[in-house]
Amino acid sequence: ADIALQNGGGVRIDIPAGEFTIADAFTLLPFSNTLWTVELTGQQIIDSLEEGLANTLDNGGSSGAYPYASGLRFDVNASAAAGSRISNVEINPRLAGSWGPIDVGATYTVVLNNFQASGGDGYNTLGEVTGAGNFVDTFTEYAQGFIDYVENLTEAGLSLQKLPLEEYSTKSYISRAGCDHSTTADCEGY
C-alpha cells in the first residue's frame, strides 16, 4: 500500500517500554478487524480525513474518529468550517522517497481496518467506496499485521522506535479556540 489510515479509537494503549509481547499487540489493537486495501483518489483521501475530523469535533463527536496515517501528513485547523479543516496534505508513498503534495486526481492504494473502511466513525467516503465492492480483504487481523511488523524489525536487529517528527501525520494543530498546539505548550482541548 502507498499509505495507511487508522482511526484513533482502534488503538487502545500506548506501546509499552521494553519487550513487546503478542499480548501487548492484542491489548493495543483489541478488535477483530481485518486489514483491507482500497484504491482511493487523493480527493477521496482528503474527504475521508475531513470526515474523520468532523466526527471528532462536531455534534458530540468522538476522539476515536481522529485520523492518523503513515505515509501521509497534514495540517489541522479545528477553528475552520467543516470541510476545510484539513490542509497542506502531503504524501510519501510507502515512506520510500520524499514528501510532496497529494495529487487529488491520482489514485493511491490505502490499507486500513475494515471498521473504518466500512464507514465506521463517520468515514462516509470510505463506506461508499467499499460498499460498492471496491476493496480487497487481506484476511489479516490488524493486530497480527502489527505483530508481523515487530517480528520483521526484530529479525533485522531493530526495535520499535518513536516516529521521527517528520513522519507524524498531524503536522500542526490549531484548536477550535484558535490555539496553535504546535507552537504553544499551554493549549487546552480540541
Indicate residue ranges for each PLM-predicted region.
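Catalytic centers of hydrolytic enzymes
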Residues: 1-190
